Amino acid sequence: MQGAERNLSAEVPDNDFDKYRNAIRDNWNRQLSKIKVESSNNDDKVNFYTALYHSMIAPTIYSDVDGAYYGPDKQIHQTNGWVNYSTFSLWDTFRAAHPLFTYTEPERANDMVKSFLAFYEQNGRLPVWNFYGSETDMMIGYHAVPVIVDAYLKGIGNFDPEKALEACVATANIDLSLIHI
């Protein structure tokens, strides 16, 4: 409860609905203006910006304002200057959403890779379909690998490339018969 209270105090210190509504609107306008569509067809613009909005709904921030989060090993962990993310539907997002993030939100893409590597350190493998600190194993494959490689090849982030390679190789060598789906 103390973590929730700290989050509330940090994120919503004032009891001012209009203030937060305006701040959220301004933030969404900043996010959606990262890509400019030039078209005389308003329906095309609405479709594009709706899809862009949908691309930003997940992954979700999983760490508290102080950097604490509950890991897949069922322990409390602490970030150090980065944000931990969860809700990785990598089967669905590695082809388009994550490459998009490398252009529109490189800092966030870096933190996502760091989240993968933290998951690996705490769970012994990269995430497949991480949902709020737990692996669901809802899909097959190693879709965190192309996300990591894409960020690395684009020069994004300050994650440890040796640790990333170790995580990719270790995950690829897991005996899948040990995973209970």
Q: PLM features: what roles do these ranges have?
A:
Residues V12-P13, I35-S40, N84-S86, A97-T102, ...:
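Second-shell loop/turn segments in exported
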Residues F48-S63, S86-A109, V149-K154:
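Alpha-helical support elements that line or immediately flank enzyme active sites
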